[in-house]
From Swiss-Prot:
Expressed in various tissues, including pharyngeal muscles, pharynx-intestinal valve, ventral nerve cord, spermatheca, rectal gland, inner labial (IL) cells of head neurons, phasmid (PHA/PHB) neurons in tail and supporting sheath/socket cells, as well as in head mesodermal cells (HMC), excretory canals and coelomocytes. It is an enzyme of class 4 (lyase). InterPro entries: Class_I_gatase-like (IPR029062), DJ-1 (IPR006287), DJ-1/PfpI (IPR002818), Prot/Nucl_acid_deglycase (IPR050325). This is Glutathione-independent glyoxalase DJR-1.2. One of its GO terms (cellular component) is nucleus. It comes from the Eukaryota. The keyword Cytoplasm applies. Keywords: Cytoplasm, Lyase. It is found in: Cytoplasm. Its EC number is 4.2.1.130. One of its GO terms (biological process) is glycolate biosynthetic process. It comes from Caenorhabditis elegans. Disulfide bonds: none annotated. Belongs to the peptidase C56 family. DJ-1 subfamily.
Amino acid sequence: MAAQKSALILLPPEDAEEIEVIVTGDVLVRGGLQVLYAGSSTEPVKCAKGARIVPDVALKDVKNKTFDIIIIPGGPGCSKLAECPVIGELLKTQVKSGGLIGAICAGPTVLLAHGIVAERVTCHYTVKDKMTEGGYKYLDDNVVISDRVITSKGPGTAFEFALKIVETLEGPEKTNSLLKPLCLAK
């Protein structure tokens, strides 16, 4: 049996978009991935709409590790991730190792801030201009995969984003097995 795949979801000190964090993490667990939430410490993070999420680990404890995917949620707090050198190191190590990076909503601006390349992206409409001015080609799709980077528009596309990650890491059969229990079957 293959080793369980791993995902690291990055949490800013505050103001993450909780739908993107919670839905993505939950779907990935249902898809068979081991999910860790990392914050600046292990103190609870107050999200943009008031939910509190307790990180499993502090960033300093995972900065030299690699994961199958590292995920950057959006929300106003992702600007703190863009300013954090440890996040930059973590993402660059992830790219060098050939791992995936996922970014949703305003999360792609963290890629821009740390020089992570993806030819095409999608993102929240409020940061579209910033991304195109930064040299990324914007696509008006709910989810875009380009150069081992998976991006998505925002809270309303969180299920589609998470399912695309599961499909990429575990295959379409696994993704299809999740649709009916999640009431997403067509």
